[in-house]
């Protein structure tokens, strides 16, 4: 009696996770349907991050996205803040989607694109006529030679491989096989730049009166690794803020003349900014986004000039207006209110009963409560949005790589084989794209080959 020892041995337990990853997880991860689904989900939430204002205060969302009635029947301020739609690009789930999408592309590159490239680089000569039958395009000629075909293919920029006079292999457009890999590298680079920017970038807002110097302090949104991006050893001075108005009184453009100062107060950069023309310094960008009125400079009788702060008043959506109050008696028992709606210098003066006393422009005086009130100037303030995104250079690099890969992918990888058997010439070829154009090219090559053969025969006769 003999014992059968051929039964398979059980695999060690530590190899099971690897087998699961290769057989179960990896095919799902590299599935094109998963990549498309992830791309659509990322695009959907990116659109939501564009439509829904990012980084605003809770009061803003409560005002613009009330519970009754809810936008689209479900979108309220509670949903926005619970899900994280007020800072989409820095939420853990959005970054996880980017990581998963990048991992899927990387796995696809190593399991499909790179093997396809290696396969394209491996080739063999066809030494039997029957091998040409499996090609998408083949022909059998009773005239012509491999050497004549080689010259024609060289003129068409094919790379020729020939070890014998009767066998030939030629190809061109191998770069088209590399293109998809470059596209994947570009997309992954863009994803890495987006993740790095979300982790290390920040957004701040400042409302700065004309003539003041400030450091970036009002951070409204920042990544967990953004502390190193905050400006520490330099500040910014708003030299002047002004608005150009149209002949009808509307705002044409608003400007800020700004200087960057070092720790010693020396100017190291200077620029006049306006909408779509920001100031950039050390990776931090200052955008002109808003404006306001910070104060009004006045004089009572022959007193020194002093500046009163002006506050934005609640008008229930009827436009913006700023106001302040100035006493006209030392015991503060009487005073008047000053109101302004723009920087054109018009100031409205109201008494304690809310009655309009006078309207003056900058530089004019008027009598109120027995004193001479002179309005010298209305001081504007510039509204700045300040951003730092260290991932932008990486994203731009990724887009450059992506565009290069797209261009490379347009090249067809075309292959041609030829075999001379006696007086018969076998020619065949295949391509990975643009099949019709390749067929036309092969027909032109065969026609050229026949014409050369006919010329040689005529010369011999």
Swiss-Prot record:
GO biological process: cytochrome complex assembly
Name this protein carries in UniProt: Cytochrome c biogenesis protein CcsB
PANTHER family: CYTOCHROME C BIOGENESIS PROTEIN CCS1, CHLOROPLASTIC
Iron-sulfur among keywords: no
Compartment(s) where it occurs, according to its Swiss-Prot or TrEMBL record: Cellular thylakoid membrane
Keywords linked to the UniProt accession: Cytochrome c-type biogenesis, Membrane, Thylakoid, Transmembrane, Transmembrane helix
Family affiliation: Belongs to the Ccs1/CcsB family.
GO cellular component, one term: plasma membrane-derived thylakoid membrane
A Pfam family that the UniProt record links to this protein: ResB
